């Protein structure tokens, strides 16, 4: 009999065996790290462009919310593009902003926890700054004028209705205190606890811990129109329904055109213990319940009678059937498709090991998810109580099926289910088959980086050669990765990190992200503030067609004069773009100057036996930099190879001590996607050291003479410093720093003297 999670032989390389987590996990992790298959895992690409916070400010592509302050904890964002409003849930406050201009007349509603609750929270040993406050975790549009909101309330969750009054130019928030109610099973106690909720048809579905200690994990339905306002929740008597769950996301998705068959899908991770060992592992799950589930009649009263769950697998297939797993689900994003019943499911996963650190993005189809729920059930059997495939009789109607008169006129609600259906689903909530990525492996991975992926937003972009799903991935270090995965002609995928953006002034974990495709903006919330980031900044790629084409950014194209936003409906004929291959030679006219004839020649003088540095930095971190030199009297260029005297760095070429034979023309070239161009052309002239030393007495004499003009004196001082024996770069910089400081002090003293003279003139 097969164990739950174990595949048939045909799928053995794609699925994982339950019970692999044992005391040998440490050695297994190390083995997996060194046996990772070649492919998109180990050959990870660098971000093509890396921009810091100052770079984003300079390019005007980031706008920080000026009304925020340190420790505000912006982890709840509600974007309503239809009504043009942006609500932020923070510590003790709710903000109402205009998404067109987040700093234009922002409105702030104060909603702190009561003093008694704060004192009790502190007495319970919680942190008064980061825990004992009202952190807003729930913001859902209830109708056109009201928002349902919940906060942690200093470990005493509280919910209420907020009303948005006024018009767009003069709106404000009003808290209806008479609607305040307990937020238990609607909102977490702990502000740092993962949590998921969705409000649809006036019902609130929430996955959270329902107790102070955070042990009782439950998925609950509450609110609703009268008289259907009773709680429906998961069964806590059996820990194999949800065991120490951490909820990530919840979404209403229709399975068929029959509204009675509509379901709520929610994603979470939980602790899983196999019966053969006491070790606990973390597994990611997708679960679903019917929206018309009202609980059982005699059993499972006020509890879900259609609850089913299946494992989400995100792994890299390895040799001998040993896969590298990313088991901790961090975030989920549903990318809509033409068929609203079949969105693409994007998930961010991380590893559970502290030795092997990694993150991955896997994509799933609703077809595969539904196939798992329509497949065999799992069953605990044997002395070790392992989950195995259930091969017995399945009662009618099939457990997990939504009640509908279309299927059976005798079953109108879940209270009409036979007792054997209720008993079966109570003991068999887990499906036997796991859900695997549509590509069989992650579409994007990060291994042993200083950060981990925590958030994901996906935007579908129309380009010249097709449509692309551009991913914006938030990290726990405050950066956002802009990534596109391209499928080539041979069906192999290529991951491209277009940009790495440091969106916060002070790096901190990204807590939430929302995208506005209408405004082409990304709203990013963190512990200390919120920023608005543009989805594209085409002008930073360069001033030529080739540079714009090499960027491979679906948002950008060459319009004949500059790199600008690509608009599919544009009537411009000179749109140049190649996302799939990034080959400017077939799209641009400025690709023939490989020898750099059009690059401006710079002249540089160096002194024999001194060092010289030729700076050359490519805008692209993915480009291969190569150096060439054309010596006098030689008719062809020679590539420079590093040795003990010549060093090639990421910033340029360093010649540690110059020789007479180093004179010549130096070329810095950049090669990217089989396209080569010249970035720098320097003509290096070597000055004879003996001649420089012969002029040193004259230089000293002229430098001591105050009658010598300042420009001439500074130029001679430069020559004097360059001619010094084996002067290091630090010594050179220190000398220049002292000289500039002395000149500033001299100028400042001269200015003070002039002021005193002018004052004396006034008094006399």
Curated annotation (Swiss-Prot):
PROSITE patterns membership = SEMA
Task: Give the signal peptide, or none.
Answer: 1-41
Cysteine pairings via disulfide bonds: 121-132, 150-159, 290-402, 314-362, 538-556, 668-733
The record's annotation in CDD domains points to: Ig_Sema3 (cd05871), Sema_3D (cd11252)
Q: What GO molecular function annotation could you give as one example from this UniProt entry? A: neuropilin binding
**Which locations, inside or outside the cell, does it occupy?**
Secreted
Chain positions carrying an annotated carbohydrate: 143, 490, 610
Region annotated Disordered, chain positions = 743-764
Q: Residues in domain Ig-like C2-type?
A: 661-740
GO CC list:
extracellular space; plasma membrane
What InterPro entries would the database entry show?
Answer: Ig-like_dom_sf, Ig-like_fold, PSI, Sema3D_Sema, Semap_dom, Semap_dom_sf, Semaphorin, WD40/YVTN_repeat-like_dom_sf
Q: Which GO biological process categories is it annotated with?
A: axon guidance; axonal fasciculation; blood vessel endothelial cell migration; cardioblast differentiation; cartilage development; cell proliferation in hindbrain; embryonic heart tube development; embryonic skeletal joint morphogenesis
Residue intervals of the Sema domain: 48-535
The family database entries (Pfam families) matched by this protein are listed as: Sema (PF01403)
Q: Which UniProt keywords apply?
A: Developmental protein, Differentiation, Disulfide bond, Glycoprotein, Immunoglobulin domain, Neurogenesis, Secreted, Signal
Give the protein's function: May play a role in the guidance of several axon pathways.
- Can you tell me which family this protein belongs to? Belongs to the semaphorin family.
Its recorded name reads: Semaphorin-3D
Q: Which organism is it from?
A: Danio rerio (Zebrafish)
């Amino acid at each position: 009999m097969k164990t739950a999670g174990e595949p048939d032989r045909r799928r053995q390389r794609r699925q994982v065996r339950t019970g692999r987590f044992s005391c040998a996990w440490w050695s297994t992790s190390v083995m997996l790290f060194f046996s990772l298959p070649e492919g998109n895992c180990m050959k990870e690409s660098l971000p093509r462009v890396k921009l810091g916070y100052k770079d984003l400010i300079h390019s005007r592509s980031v706008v920080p919310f000026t009304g925020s302050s340190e420790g505000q904890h912006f982890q709840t964002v509600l974007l309503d593009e239809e009504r043009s409003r942006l609500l932020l849930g923070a510590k003790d406050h709710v903000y109402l902003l205009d998404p067109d201009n987040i700093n234009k007349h922002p409105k702030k509603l104060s909603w702190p926890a009561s003093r008694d609750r704060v004192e009790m929270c502190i007495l319970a040993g919680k942190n008064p700054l980061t825990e004992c406050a009202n952190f807003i975790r729930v913001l859902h549009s209830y109708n056109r004028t009201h928002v349902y909101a919940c906060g942690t309330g200093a470990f005493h969750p509280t919910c209420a209705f907020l009303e948005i009054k006024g018009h767009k130019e003069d709106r404000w928030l009003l808290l209806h205190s008479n609607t305040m109610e307990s937020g238990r099973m609607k909102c977490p106690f702990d502000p740092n606890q993962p949590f998921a909720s969705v409000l649809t048809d006036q019902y609130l579905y929430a996955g959270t811990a329902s107790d102070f200690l955070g042990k009782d994990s439950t998925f609950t339905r509450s609110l609703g129109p009268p008289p259907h306002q009773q709680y429906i929740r998961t069964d806590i008597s059996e820990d194999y329904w949800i065991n120490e769950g951490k909820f990530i996301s919840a979404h209403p998705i229709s399975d068929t055109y029959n509204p009675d068959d509509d379901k709520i899908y929610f994603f979470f991770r939980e602790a899983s213990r196999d019966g053969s060992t006491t070790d606990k592992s973390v597994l990611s799950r997708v679960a679903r319940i019917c929206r018309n589930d009202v609980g059982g009649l005699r059993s499972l009263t006020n509890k879900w009678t259609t609850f089913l769950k299946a494992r989400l697998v995100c792994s890299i297939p390895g040799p001998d059937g040993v896969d590298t797993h990313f088991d901790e689900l961090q975030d989920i994003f549903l990318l809509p498709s033409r068929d609203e019943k079949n969105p693409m499911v994007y998930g961010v996963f991380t590893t559970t090991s502290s030795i092997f650190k990694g993150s991955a993005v896997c994509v799933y189809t609703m077809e595969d998810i539904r196939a798992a729920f329509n497949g065999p059930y799992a069953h605990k059997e044997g002395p070790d109580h392992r989950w195995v495939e259930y091969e017995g009789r399945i009662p009618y109607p099939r457990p997990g099926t939504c009640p509908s008169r279309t299927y059976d006129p005798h079953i109108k609600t879940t209270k009409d289910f036979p007792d054997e259906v209720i008993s079966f689903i109570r003991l068999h909530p887990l499906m036997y088959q796991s859900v695997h990525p549509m590509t069989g492996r992650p579409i994007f991975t990060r291994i042993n980086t200083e950060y981990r992926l925590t958030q994901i937003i996906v935007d579908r972009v129309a380009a010249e050669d097709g449509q692309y799903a551009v991913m914006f991935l938030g990290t726990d270090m405050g950066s956002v990765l802009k990534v596109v995965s391209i499928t080539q002609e041979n069906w192999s995928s290529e991951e491209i990190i277009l940009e790495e953006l440091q969106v916060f002034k002070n790096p901190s974990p990204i807590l939430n992200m929302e995208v506005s495709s209408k405004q082409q903006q990304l709203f990013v919330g963190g512990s200390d503030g919120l920023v608005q980031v543009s989805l594209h900044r085409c002008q930073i790629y360069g001033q030529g067609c080739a540079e714009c084409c090499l960027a491979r950014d679906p948002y950008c194209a060459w319009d004949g004069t500059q790199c600008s936003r690509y608009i599919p409906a544009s009537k411009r004929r000179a749109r140049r773009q190649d996302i799939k291959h990034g080959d400017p030679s077939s799209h641009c006219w400025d690709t023939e100057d490989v020898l750099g004839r059009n690059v401006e020649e710079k002249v540089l003088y160096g002194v024999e036996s001194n060092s010289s540095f030729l700076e050359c930095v490519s805008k692209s971190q993915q480009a291969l930099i190569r150096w060439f030199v054309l010596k006098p009297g030689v008719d062809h260029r020679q590539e420079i190879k590093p040795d003990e005297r010549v060093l090639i760095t990421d910033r340029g070429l360093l010649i540690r001590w110059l020789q007479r034979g180093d004179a010549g023309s130096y070329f810095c070239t950049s090669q990217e996607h089989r396209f080569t161009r010249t970035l720098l052309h320097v003509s290096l002239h070597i000055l004879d050291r003996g001649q420089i030393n012969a002029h040193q007495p004259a230089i000293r004499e002229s430098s001591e003479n105050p009658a010598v003009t300042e420009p001439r004196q500074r130029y001679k001082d430069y020559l004097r410093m360059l001619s010094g024996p084996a002067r290091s770069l630090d010594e050179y910089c220190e000398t220049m720093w002292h000289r500039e400081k002395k000149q500033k002090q001299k100028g400042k003293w001269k200015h003070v003297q002039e002021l005193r003279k002018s004052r004396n003139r006034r008094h006399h």
